[in-house]
Amino acid sequence: MKFRAALLFPLLALSGASQSVQPAPDASAIIRKAFSRQEDFFEQARNYTYIRHEETRRLDRAGKVTKAESNVHEVTILYGEPYRKLIKKDGRGLDAKEAAKEQRKMDDEIAKRGRDQEKRRRETEKELADQRKALAEIADAIDWHIEGQETLAGRPAWVISGTPKAGYKLKSQEAKVLTKMRGKVWIDREDSRMVKADAVVNDTISFGWFLFRIQPGFHFTFEMTRVNDQVWLPRHGWLKGTAKVAGLKTYRMEMDMRYSDYRRFQSDSRVVQSGPPE
């Protein structure tokens, strides 16, 4: 799943000890500035490789785990976009046959991306343009409220929540999806970066002509970490809830994603700067 919107709802706090009364910060202005920097995040993130740990658990009606699996991927950059190569499955390394299969898949993808560079560049430009419009619309469609201030990774962050404006007509699909959630976001005060989001779905979200439907109560969290004291990159993602496929199959699941071992990417002749990270 691409991490696109860590844009939901933030909280905020008042800057504390001053003898004079300080004007309340403008929550909407904080959100707009953070949203405007999202594209910088994509630009910076594709300069790093990392390890992605993913655990998926299937649940029964009572919430008990019925099946669990884990995958570890090495994420590198091919032609400006991330590529995930499986290196571990269910706690064990790949055997020679499995490793060779993964390498063939990677080689095939390198060849494919090399052929489709111009097409992928246009698709990425459109995707980023659509996201800019969606973010601008979300900033307008929500009444943002400062709720406090917290310290994340030793740094002060505004905590901001939001309530959709009654009667506001939304155009973009991403904006419509996010207004079906309730939650908050944390904005780093110094960098104006969105560094954490927490949201719960409060209305059914449908994708693909209603074939895939996320049910109310689905819970998402996402956190960032500061790497090399200069760029914010994903640290942890978690989700839990129920989804239905084609109105027939029900999936109850929990997924935990952790990101580690960030390293500055060393480009080679196959790399073309073009796309946002996963």
Tell me the role of every PLM-derived stretch:
Residues Q19-R182, R189-K196, V200-F218, E223-H236, ...:
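Structured extracytoplasmic
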Residues M1-K2:
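N-terminal secretory signal peptides that target proteins for export/translocation
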Residues A5-S15:
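Bacterial N-terminal signal peptides
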